[in-house]
């Protein structure tokens, strides 16, 4: 049943037009050989920059993907943490060697920087490890993390790297939009601009309000100037927007995927259906 569910998921990914899949510990539930079999049926590459096939001494899957979209060259690589195994006898580890993620990330950045404008890491390290990586390695623009399953509505910026997280259990979708206003590849989060604009409106209200004491107006005026200065610094810069939305029962299903799921459920009825997000 687990293998059939894996095949169903892969067929769905093919229909959705995936560009790449970063390997995580759940993908190894049925072992190395099954995952290699699945990769041959995928219409997109499986990525892992630090999982080695113990038999051959080579990478299990390709280390990175290069894509060009609207003239922008994008490099995508993937990291897996050996800490996610339960121990040396974990079945998922059989036949695999995991290279050090930090050393691998450094090597990937050196490899990708001359070839790309934007570097994205698909991380299966855990959120704390993503933070640590961003603090110690420069050159990665976005870390899209999984495993921890945190909803980061306001992705933190660590040095020059934004950290995003996949929400848990496939219950949410996410979308990232980039708006380029210049040919540099640094960004600010649109939520930062909205927050500053909201702050400026409130400060202006306080300055105009009759009940605001005169002794406080100098402080509010300084706050207004600081906020306007911060907004001015964003003008002309590149922007990204991060949207997370729940996949509710009322959302319309894709007819082909719905047919596949219904056929699977008729063969393997589940005792309980997961509750949709609220």
Report each predicted region and the residues it spans.
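Acidic, metal/ion-coordinating pockets
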Residues: 1-278
